[in-house]
Amino acid sequence: MSEKNTGRVTIPTNLDVVPETIELMKRWGADAIRDCDGTEFPEELTKTGAKIYATYYTTRKDNEWAKANPDEVQQCYIMSGFYTAVESELQIPLMKGISDELMQVNTRDDIKRWWEVVDRSTGQVVSTKQWEYNEESGCVCIHEAEPFHEYTVSFLAYIIWDPVHMYNAVTNDWKDFEHQITFDVRQPKTHKYSMERLRKFCEEHPYVNVIRYTTFFHQFTLMFDELKREKYVDWYGYSASVSPYILEQFEKEMGYKFRPEYIIDQGYYNNQYRVPGKEYKDFQAFQRREVAKLAKEMVDITHECGKEAMMFLGDHWIGTEPFMEEFATIGLDAVVGSVGNGSTLRLISDIEGVKYTEGRFLPYFFPDTFHEGGDPVKEAKENWVTARRAILRKPIDRIGYGGYLKLALDFPEFLDYVESVCNEFRELYENAKGTTPYCVKKVAVLNSWGKIRSWGCHMVHHALYQKQNYSYAGIIEALSGAPFDVKFISFDDILKDKDILKDIDVIINVGDGDTAHTGGAVWENAVISAAIREFVYRGGGFIGVGEPAGHQYQGHYLQLADLIGVEKETGFTLNYDKYNWEEHKNHFIPVSYTHLTLPTNREV
């Protein structure tokens, strides 16, 4: 293999596959080796001349410390189920539907201060004098409840089994292992200990070139039920980034009292379809500042020890949003992330302020794919072809794979296919890197989140679609490989300076009405609707998908009905007769829709 056709590839390894690792390094042209969760790095491979990544867990893999400091174990806000009172006394079980291997109710801190019982029929907070918690039964007992009102309890729970470790253990059917407890690096004792622990790790691993942080401090929201099935997931969720220690800091800095409801949000947990309120946005900004400061401490130690600092974009990544200003202050050398499609590739490749970016391609070498009868080649093809067009728009600098290499060795056709992928990637990179791709227009995706959700719009879980949002996410996916200069803006951006629209050719507003993706009640602000109308009046384009600007207000459901020439019938206008049923079947839109085969990211 020529020198030009080697490099830019990272390969996983383990103690039991040393010769095979060396062979595949040659075949795939790999110039970096990594360990993974559940594997160990072989000493024999330290002399290969390859760059060595060490996966480093800032918040787990040290149960001795976690058990000795239970007060500094990480916590999560959870809302109980909805329960209807039929008399004045009501018992609400807190952990019903939640794995007790994953979470443990926190009674160490003042529950009357940090918990909240809410009458969901009125939205009012129930006085702390009207309820208490019975630790033995695991229930909150509400007194003087209003019959036939619904109630919930918002409470803090310790994360006693790291959710990612739990997922890996369940997926791989691990036996005879200890549950890894998630400790909180933000808190004083663990903060001090973690810096010493990191320095010691660097000193004891002189052969390691890159510390691959997986990740920093707070896991995205991931909960499992009693059967260890995924119950709730939000790849952008902040509900597992809380503790009384953190919340007291927030109160001191922001000047107002924190409510659990700022996180709980009626049980929606401020997922990306919810229009974020001021308090939640304040909390996000606070977390980004604090996480960036602490992450910088670790990166500085890494650099002092002569190593590079790489961050995995996922798992405990909350607070490190790479498109926000705070990210650049961390000082990372690189970012690596999982590539599930074109959107998630751009989520990595569009990151600025690092020396290089890397995409971990699928499938991950786990038994859920690599088993008798499994078809890893099919998954690898779909993954590569889906991401390929996005690479041509904005390439990542490296690719790699992860998991148990031993499993992949039983699939020779897969090994052959990955070899072809590595060669093709290097060829694409050599031709695309440093060039400016052709752009037809400048496009802005407009929603309530803006740049903080760049390339992640409509992504509930990483690169996974739901039937309800598949078409919306598909718009973002199409943009990832299309000839447009794409940016993501928020309604707040327009309110701050509507001149931001002068540099844009087309605005896209995509999603269901009354969600964060279309704006909801923000359309009651005439500044917004007037700015968009003026933009179109002066020659700009507006594309709405789903229920653009959808919100019932002042005689319209679609607030730009005059602009887009269509209104949604909600029943409110059935009294108006309609006579214009003329169809223009030869118009370019229906003609294109019927006959045109659009290019997709799935062309093989």
Regions from the language model: what does each represent?
Residues 7-12, 32, 174-191, 276-291, ...:
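The substrate-binding groove and active-site-proximal loops of carbohydrate-active enzymes
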Residues 10-22, 37-38, 311-319, 478-498:
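A short, well-structured beta->alpha microelement
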Residues 17-44, 48, 200-212, 387, ...:
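Catalytic domains of carbohydrate-active enzymes, especially glycoside hydrolases
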Residues 38-75, 227-235, 298-301:
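Aromatic-lined substrate-binding rim segments of carbohydrate-active enzymes
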Residues 45, 63-66, 198-199, 209-216, ...:
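Hydrophobic targeting/anchoring helices
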Residues 70-329, 347, 433:
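Polysaccharide-binding and catalytic clefts of secreted carbohydrate-active enzymes
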Residues 594-603:
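Conserved small/polar residues in nucleotide/adenosyl-binding loops
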